[in-house]
Protein backbone atom coordinates (compact mmCIF):
# COMPACT_ATOMS: atom_id res chain seq x y z
CA UNK A 1 0.00 0.00 0.00
CA UNK A 2 1.34 3.43 -0.92
CA UNK A 3 1.59 5.69 2.11
CA UNK A 4 0.45 9.31 1.72
CA UNK A 5 0.48 11.57 4.75
CA UNK A 6 -0.93 14.82 3.28
CA UNK A 7 -3.87 15.69 1.03
CA UNK A 8 -6.05 18.68 0.19
CA UNK A 9 -9.80 18.29 -0.31
CA UNK A 10 -12.92 20.44 -0.63
CA UNK A 11 -16.10 19.62 1.27
CA UNK A 12 -19.49 21.09 0.43
CA UNK A 13 -22.57 20.65 2.60
CA UNK A 14 -26.00 20.46 0.99
CA UNK A 15 -28.18 23.52 0.53
CA UNK A 16 -31.48 23.75 2.33
CA UNK A 17 -34.60 23.25 0.22
CA UNK A 18 -36.76 26.26 -0.59
CA UNK A 19 -40.08 26.80 1.15
CA UNK A 20 -43.20 26.29 -0.95
CA UNK A 21 -45.79 28.86 -2.00
CA UNK A 22 -49.10 26.99 -2.09
CA UNK A 23 -52.74 27.52 -1.19
CA UNK A 24 -55.32 25.04 0.00
CA UNK A 25 -57.77 24.18 -2.77
CA UNK A 26 -60.60 21.85 -1.80
CA UNK A 27 -64.28 21.51 -2.49
CA UNK A 28 -66.38 23.55 -0.10
CA UNK A 29 -63.26 25.43 1.06
CA UNK A 30 -63.25 28.52 -1.18
CA UNK A 31 -60.60 30.38 0.80
CA UNK A 32 -58.39 27.69 2.25
CA UNK A 33 -55.40 29.91 2.93
CA UNK A 34 -51.68 29.21 2.52
CA UNK A 35 -50.43 25.65 3.04
CA UNK A 36 -46.88 25.69 1.63
CA UNK A 37 -44.53 23.28 3.41
CA UNK A 38 -40.97 23.89 4.61
CA UNK A 39 -37.88 22.87 2.68
CA UNK A 40 -35.68 20.10 4.08
CA UNK A 41 -32.30 20.80 5.64
CA UNK A 42 -29.22 20.13 3.54
CA UNK A 43 -26.98 17.21 4.42
CA UNK A 44 -23.86 17.85 6.48
CA UNK A 45 -20.35 16.53 5.83
CA UNK A 46 -19.10 14.46 8.78
CA UNK A 47 -15.55 13.21 9.30
CA UNK A 48 -15.04 9.95 11.19
CA UNK A 49 -11.80 8.35 12.39
CA UNK A 50 -11.50 4.75 11.21
CA UNK A 51 -8.96 2.02 11.95
CA UNK A 52 -9.61 0.54 8.51
CA UNK A 53 -7.52 3.22 6.79
CA UNK A 54 -3.78 3.70 7.18
CA UNK A 55 -3.07 6.31 4.50
CA UNK A 56 -4.53 9.40 2.81
CA UNK A 57 -3.85 7.95 -0.64
CA UNK A 58 -7.55 7.78 -1.59
CA UNK A 59 -7.89 11.51 -0.97
CA UNK A 60 -5.29 12.23 -3.63
CA UNK A 61 -7.61 10.52 -6.11
CA UNK A 62 -10.90 12.09 -4.99
CA UNK A 63 -10.66 15.67 -3.79
CA UNK A 64 -14.28 16.88 -3.75
CA UNK A 65 -16.96 15.68 -1.34
CA UNK A 66 -20.51 17.02 -1.54
CA UNK A 67 -23.54 16.19 0.61
CA UNK A 68 -27.05 16.12 -0.97
CA UNK A 69 -29.33 19.17 -0.93
CA UNK A 70 -32.56 19.26 1.01
CA UNK A 71 -35.80 18.77 -0.91
CA UNK A 72 -38.07 21.75 -1.52
CA UNK A 73 -41.35 22.08 0.38
CA UNK A 74 -44.67 21.04 -1.18
CA UNK A 75 -48.33 21.90 -0.91
CA UNK A 76 -50.72 20.59 1.73
CA UNK A 77 -48.11 21.48 4.38
CA UNK A 78 -45.79 18.71 3.18
CA UNK A 79 -42.20 19.35 4.20
CA UNK A 80 -39.27 18.47 1.96
CA UNK A 81 -36.99 15.57 2.83
CA UNK A 82 -33.73 16.31 4.60
CA UNK A 83 -30.55 15.68 2.63
CA UNK A 84 -28.57 12.66 3.83
CA UNK A 85 -25.38 13.41 5.73
CA UNK A 86 -22.16 12.45 3.97
CA UNK A 87 -19.72 10.59 6.24
CA UNK A 88 -16.09 10.62 5.15
CA UNK A 89 -13.79 8.13 6.89
CA UNK A 90 -10.22 9.20 7.66
CA UNK A 91 -7.32 7.30 9.22
CA UNK A 92 -6.94 7.60 12.97
CA UNK A 93 -4.33 10.27 13.67
CA UNK A 94 -5.47 12.71 10.96
CA UNK A 95 -5.38 16.41 11.71
CA UNK A 96 -7.81 18.64 9.78
CA UNK A 97 -6.83 22.19 8.89
CA UNK A 98 -9.13 24.74 7.23
CA UNK A 99 -7.33 26.64 4.47
CA UNK A 100 -8.37 30.28 3.98
CA UNK A 101 -6.81 33.40 2.50
CA UNK A 102 -5.57 34.32 5.98
CA UNK A 103 -3.77 31.01 6.50
CA UNK A 104 -4.59 27.69 8.15
CA UNK A 105 -6.61 26.89 11.26
CA UNK A 106 -6.61 23.53 13.05
CA UNK A 107 -10.22 22.33 13.24
CA UNK A 108 -9.82 18.94 14.91
CA UNK A 109 -7.49 16.04 15.60
CA UNK A 110 -8.98 12.60 14.96
CA UNK A 111 -6.66 10.84 17.39
CA UNK A 112 -9.21 8.35 18.76
CA UNK A 113 -11.07 5.65 16.78
CA UNK A 114 -14.68 6.42 15.87
CA UNK A 115 -14.24 10.13 16.68
CA UNK A 116 -16.69 12.18 14.59
CA UNK A 117 -16.57 15.86 13.62
CA UNK A 118 -19.11 17.86 11.61
CA UNK A 119 -16.82 19.79 9.29
CA UNK A 120 -19.48 21.40 7.07
CA UNK A 121 -23.00 22.12 8.31
CA UNK A 122 -25.89 21.72 5.92
CA UNK A 123 -28.07 24.74 5.18
CA UNK A 124 -31.44 25.06 6.90
CA UNK A 125 -34.54 24.60 4.83
CA UNK A 126 -36.68 27.64 4.03
CA UNK A 127 -40.12 28.12 5.55
CA UNK A 128 -43.25 27.76 3.45
CA UNK A 129 -45.75 30.57 2.99
CA UNK A 130 -48.03 29.18 5.73
CA UNK A 131 -45.61 30.72 8.27
CA UNK A 132 -46.05 34.23 6.89
CA UNK A 133 -49.82 34.68 7.09
CA UNK A 134 -50.98 37.48 9.36
CA UNK A 135 -54.02 39.58 10.10
CA UNK A 136 -52.97 42.02 7.39
CA UNK A 137 -51.75 39.48 4.83
CA UNK A 138 -54.05 36.47 4.70
CA UNK A 139 -52.58 35.07 1.49
CA UNK A 140 -48.79 35.57 1.37
CA UNK A 141 -47.40 34.80 -2.05
CA UNK A 142 -43.81 34.37 -0.96
CA UNK A 143 -41.74 31.81 0.94
CA UNK A 144 -38.27 31.63 2.40
CA UNK A 145 -35.32 30.35 0.39
CA UNK A 146 -33.15 27.61 1.83
CA UNK A 147 -29.77 28.50 3.30
CA UNK A 148 -26.56 27.69 1.46
CA UNK A 149 -24.50 24.84 2.93
CA UNK A 150 -20.99 25.45 4.20
CA UNK A 151 -18.06 25.02 1.82
CA UNK A 152 -14.56 24.47 3.18
CA UNK A 153 -11.13 23.80 1.77
CA UNK A 154 -9.27 21.38 4.02
CA UNK A 155 -5.72 20.19 4.35
CA UNK A 156 -5.42 16.72 5.85
CA UNK A 157 -2.24 15.75 7.65
CA UNK A 158 -1.73 12.24 8.96
CA UNK A 159 0.59 11.56 11.84
CA UNK A 160 1.02 7.82 12.17
CA UNK A 161 -0.47 6.18 15.23
CA UNK A 162 1.64 3.09 15.86
CA UNK A 163 2.84 1.02 18.79
CA UNK A 164 6.48 1.03 17.72
CA UNK A 165 8.43 3.48 15.60
CA UNK A 166 11.60 2.27 13.86
CA UNK A 167 14.17 5.01 13.60
CA UNK A 168 17.87 5.41 13.08
CA UNK A 169 20.50 6.60 10.65
CA UNK A 170 20.01 5.93 6.92
CA UNK A 171 20.81 2.41 5.70
CA UNK A 172 20.52 0.87 9.17
CA UNK A 173 18.37 -2.02 7.93
CA UNK A 174 15.02 -0.83 9.33
CA UNK A 175 13.11 -1.76 6.18
CA UNK A 176 14.67 -5.23 6.12
CA UNK A 177 13.60 -5.76 9.72
CA UNK A 178 9.98 -4.69 9.17
CA UNK A 179 9.78 -6.90 6.08
CA UNK A 180 10.93 -9.90 8.15
CA UNK A 181 8.49 -9.48 11.04
CA UNK A 182 5.40 -8.29 9.12
CA UNK A 183 3.77 -8.44 5.71
CA UNK A 184 5.06 -4.97 4.79
CA UNK A 185 7.13 -4.90 1.60
CA UNK A 186 9.14 -1.68 1.60
CA UNK A 187 11.82 -0.87 -0.96
CA UNK A 188 15.14 -2.37 0.18
CA UNK A 189 18.53 -1.52 -1.34
CA UNK A 190 22.16 -1.11 -0.29
CA UNK A 191 22.25 2.69 -0.32
CA UNK A 192 21.13 5.42 2.11
CA UNK A 193 17.65 6.98 1.97
CA UNK A 194 16.07 3.97 0.27
CA UNK A 195 12.95 4.66 2.36
CA UNK A 196 11.50 8.06 1.42
CA UNK A 197 8.02 7.60 2.88
CA UNK A 198 6.97 5.87 6.13
CA UNK A 199 5.93 2.23 5.88
CA UNK A 200 3.48 0.47 8.16
CA UNK A 201 3.65 -3.16 9.21
CA UNK A 202 1.52 -5.23 11.58
CA UNK A 203 2.82 -8.10 13.73
CA UNK A 204 0.18 -10.64 14.80
CA UNK A 205 0.60 -12.79 17.89
CA UNK A 206 0.48 -16.47 16.85
CA UNK A 207 -0.99 -17.47 20.22
CA UNK A 208 -3.70 -14.80 20.11
CA UNK A 209 -4.45 -13.45 16.59
CA UNK A 210 -6.49 -10.64 18.13
CA UNK A 211 -3.28 -9.18 19.58
CA UNK A 212 -1.53 -6.94 17.07
CA UNK A 213 1.46 -4.65 17.17
CA UNK A 214 1.65 -1.86 14.58
CA UNK A 215 5.14 -0.83 13.46
CA UNK A 216 6.02 2.38 11.63
CA UNK A 217 9.23 2.37 9.59
CA UNK A 218 10.35 6.01 9.74
CA UNK A 219 12.77 7.08 6.97
CA UNK A 220 16.39 7.54 8.03
CA UNK A 221 17.29 10.63 10.06
CA UNK A 222 20.52 12.59 9.82
CA UNK A 223 22.27 15.24 11.87
CA UNK A 224 20.27 18.46 11.65
CA UNK A 225 16.94 16.65 11.17
CA UNK A 226 15.31 18.91 13.79
CA UNK A 227 15.96 21.90 11.47
CA UNK A 228 14.44 20.11 8.48
CA UNK A 229 17.64 18.67 6.98
CA UNK A 230 16.99 15.49 5.01
CA UNK A 231 13.22 16.14 5.25
CA UNK A 232 13.67 15.78 9.01
CA UNK A 233 10.55 17.75 9.99
CA UNK A 234 8.40 15.66 7.71
CA UNK A 235 9.72 12.41 9.19
CA UNK A 236 10.01 13.44 12.85
CA UNK A 237 6.32 14.36 13.08
CA UNK A 238 5.47 10.66 12.75
CA UNK A 239 7.66 9.77 15.73
CA UNK A 240 5.35 11.86 17.94
CA UNK A 241 2.49 9.39 17.49
CA UNK A 242 4.34 6.21 18.47
CA UNK A 243 4.15 4.63 21.92
CA UNK A 244 7.77 3.50 22.04
CA UNK A 245 10.80 3.62 19.78
CA UNK A 246 12.99 0.89 18.32
CA UNK A 247 16.29 2.61 17.60
CA UNK A 248 18.28 0.59 15.04
CA UNK A 249 21.94 1.23 14.30
CA UNK A 250 24.03 -0.60 11.72
CA UNK A 251 27.08 -2.40 13.10
CA UNK A 252 29.01 -0.49 10.43
CA UNK A 253 28.36 2.68 12.45
CA UNK A 254 29.58 1.12 15.71
CA UNK A 255 33.28 1.10 16.52
CA UNK A 256 35.13 0.58 19.77
CA UNK A 257 37.87 2.88 18.44
CA UNK A 258 35.53 5.82 17.80
CA UNK A 259 36.63 8.96 19.71
CA UNK A 260 32.97 9.69 20.50
CA UNK A 261 32.36 6.18 21.80
CA UNK A 262 30.75 3.19 20.07
CA UNK A 263 27.21 4.39 20.74
CA UNK A 264 27.54 7.88 19.23
CA UNK A 265 25.04 6.96 16.49
CA UNK A 266 22.35 6.40 19.12
CA UNK A 267 23.26 9.64 20.87
CA UNK A 268 23.15 11.66 17.63
CA UNK A 269 19.59 10.67 16.76
CA UNK A 270 18.42 11.03 20.37
CA UNK A 271 19.78 14.58 20.39
CA UNK A 272 17.81 15.35 17.23
CA UNK A 273 14.66 13.99 18.90
CA UNK A 274 15.14 16.21 21.95
CA UNK A 275 15.78 19.29 19.82
CA UNK A 276 12.62 18.64 17.84
CA UNK A 277 10.46 17.92 20.90
CA UNK A 278 11.76 17.59 24.47
CA UNK A 279 9.07 15.00 25.26
CA UNK A 280 10.46 12.65 22.61
CA UNK A 281 13.66 12.39 24.61
CA UNK A 282 11.65 10.72 27.39
CA UNK A 283 10.00 8.17 25.08
CA UNK A 284 10.65 4.52 25.97
CA UNK A 285 13.32 3.19 23.62
CA UNK A 286 14.71 -0.18 22.56
CA UNK A 287 18.25 0.07 21.17
CA UNK A 288 19.31 -2.48 18.55
CA UNK A 289 22.54 -3.02 16.61
CA UNK A 290 21.77 -4.61 13.22
CA UNK A 291 23.81 -6.34 10.50
CA UNK A 292 25.99 -8.32 12.90
CA UNK A 293 26.52 -10.81 10.07
CA UNK A 294 29.01 -8.28 8.66
CA UNK A 295 31.33 -8.64 11.67
CA UNK A 296 33.25 -11.54 13.15
CA UNK A 297 31.60 -13.17 16.19
CA UNK A 298 34.55 -12.03 18.32
CA UNK A 299 33.95 -8.39 17.38
CA UNK A 300 30.24 -8.70 18.13
CA UNK A 301 31.00 -10.24 21.52
CA UNK A 302 33.38 -7.37 22.26
CA UNK A 303 30.53 -4.93 21.56
CA UNK A 304 28.22 -6.91 23.85
CA UNK A 305 30.81 -6.73 26.62
CA UNK A 306 31.27 -2.98 26.09
CA UNK A 307 27.50 -2.40 26.28
CA UNK A 308 27.35 -4.34 29.55
CA UNK A 309 30.31 -2.39 30.93
CA UNK A 310 28.62 0.89 29.99
CA UNK A 311 25.39 -0.22 31.68
CA UNK A 312 23.58 -0.01 28.38
CA UNK A 313 20.90 -2.48 27.27
CA UNK A 314 21.59 -3.10 23.59
CA UNK A 315 20.17 -5.95 21.50
CA UNK A 316 22.19 -7.40 18.61
CA UNK A 317 20.63 -8.96 15.52
CA UNK A 318 20.91 -9.57 11.81
CA UNK A 319 17.61 -8.82 10.08
CA UNK A 320 18.98 -10.46 6.93
CA UNK A 321 19.87 -13.85 8.45
CA UNK A 322 17.33 -13.74 11.28
CA UNK A 323 19.88 -14.06 14.08
CA UNK A 324 18.64 -12.30 17.20
CA UNK A 325 15.39 -11.13 15.55
CA UNK A 326 13.17 -13.27 17.79
CA UNK A 327 14.68 -11.72 20.91
CA UNK A 328 14.02 -8.21 19.59
CA UNK A 329 10.43 -9.09 18.66
CA UNK A 330 9.81 -10.62 22.09
CA UNK A 331 11.12 -7.46 23.75
CA UNK A 332 8.82 -5.32 21.58
CA UNK A 333 5.79 -7.36 22.68
CA UNK A 334 6.91 -7.06 26.30
CA UNK A 335 7.25 -3.29 26.03
CA UNK A 336 3.83 -2.97 24.41
CA UNK A 337 2.16 -5.07 27.12
CA UNK A 338 3.95 -3.12 29.84
CA UNK A 339 2.74 0.18 28.38
CA UNK A 340 -0.83 -1.21 28.20
CA UNK A 341 -0.72 -2.02 31.92
CA UNK A 342 0.80 1.35 32.79
CA UNK A 343 -1.81 3.29 30.79
CA UNK A 344 -4.62 1.27 32.38
CA UNK A 345 -3.26 2.09 35.87
CA UNK A 346 -3.04 5.78 34.98
CA UNK A 347 -6.66 5.80 33.81
CA UNK A 348 -7.72 3.94 36.97
CA UNK A 349 -5.85 6.43 39.17
CA UNK A 350 -7.46 9.37 37.37
CA UNK A 351 -10.89 7.80 37.87
CA UNK A 352 -10.29 7.19 41.57
CA UNK A 353 -9.12 10.76 42.10
CA UNK A 354 -12.18 12.04 40.31
CA UNK A 355 -14.47 9.93 42.48
CA UNK A 356 -12.92 11.31 45.64
CA UNK A 357 -13.55 14.93 44.70
CA UNK A 358 -16.40 16.61 46.52
CA UNK A 359 -19.11 17.90 44.27
CA UNK A 360 -20.26 21.48 44.71
CA UNK A 361 -23.65 20.67 43.15
CA UNK A 362 -26.52 20.20 45.57
CA UNK A 363 -29.05 17.60 44.49
CA UNK A 364 -32.59 17.86 45.81
CA UNK A 365 -34.86 14.84 45.44
CA UNK A 366 -38.53 15.58 44.93
CA UNK A 367 -41.23 12.93 45.31
CA UNK A 368 -44.16 13.54 43.00
UniProtKB/Swiss-Prot annotation:
Pfam families with a match to the protein in the record: GTP1_OBG, MMR_HSR1
EC numbers for this chain: 3.6.5.-
Domain Obg as annotated: residue spans: 1-161
Protein name: GTPase Obg
Organism: Nitratidesulfovibrio vulgaris (strain DSM 19637 / Miyazaki F)
Record keywords, A-Z: Cytoplasm, GTP-binding, Hydrolase, Magnesium, Metal-binding, Nucleotide-binding
Names of the cofactor(s): Mg(2+)
Gene Ontology, cellular component aspect: cytoplasm
Protein purpose: An essential GTPase which binds GTP, GDP and possibly (p)ppGpp with moderate affinity, with high nucleotide exchange rates and a fairly low GTP hydrolysis rate. Plays a role in control of the cell cycle, stress response, ribosome biogenesis and in those bacteria that undergo differentiation, in morphogenesis control.
Record localization: Cytoplasm
Listed GO MF terms: GTP binding; GTPase activity; magnesium ion binding
Amino acid sequence: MRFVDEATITVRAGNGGNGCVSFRREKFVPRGGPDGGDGGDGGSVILRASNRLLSLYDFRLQRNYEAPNGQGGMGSQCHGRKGDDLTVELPVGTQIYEVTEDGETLLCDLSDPETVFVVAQGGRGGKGNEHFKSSTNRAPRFAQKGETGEVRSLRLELKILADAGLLGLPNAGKSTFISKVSAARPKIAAYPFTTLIPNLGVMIDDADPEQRLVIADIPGLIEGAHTGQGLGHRFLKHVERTRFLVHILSVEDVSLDSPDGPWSGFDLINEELVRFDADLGQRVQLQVVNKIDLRDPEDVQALRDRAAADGRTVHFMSALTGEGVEDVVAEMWRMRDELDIHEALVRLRETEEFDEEESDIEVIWVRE
